[in-house]
Amino acid sequence: MLEHESKERQDAYEAVFTALAHPVRRRILITVYFNGGSMTAGQIAKKFEQAWPTTTRHLQVLEAAGLLRHRRQGRSRHYRLDCRRLELVRDWLAWFSRAPG
């Protein structure tokens, strides 16, 4: 962890990197991106061969990391990409490109 970063920011990095560590969650983000940036939970689940609770858990982790947001429409949950956390991580990674050595 970078000592100059706030605890809140460090927690945000941790949540994003944890979410992105799983290949299925990365594929979910890519799938949503290539489907216009928004999909229902049911549409996402159909793209992956796994149990519904597993898909739901992946969506919860992505949402907790701030990478997806959802809104309810009737009985459906519509998930939308939220790239602000990715920008935060991009800036964190850019810091290392300027590091000495």
Model-derived segments and their meaning:
Residues 66:
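Glycine-centered, phosphate/nucleic-acid-interacting loop/turn motifs that mediate DNA/RNA or nucleotide
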Residues 59-60:
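Short, hydrophobic-biased segments on the C-terminal half of alpha helices
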Residues 11-51, 73-85:
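N-terminal helix-turn-helix DNA-binding core of bacterial DNA-binding proteins
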Residues 1-13, 30-34, 83-101:
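Amphipathic alpha-helical dimerization/coiled-coil segments
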Residues 70:
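Short beta-strand "wing" residues that participate in macromolecule-binding interfaces
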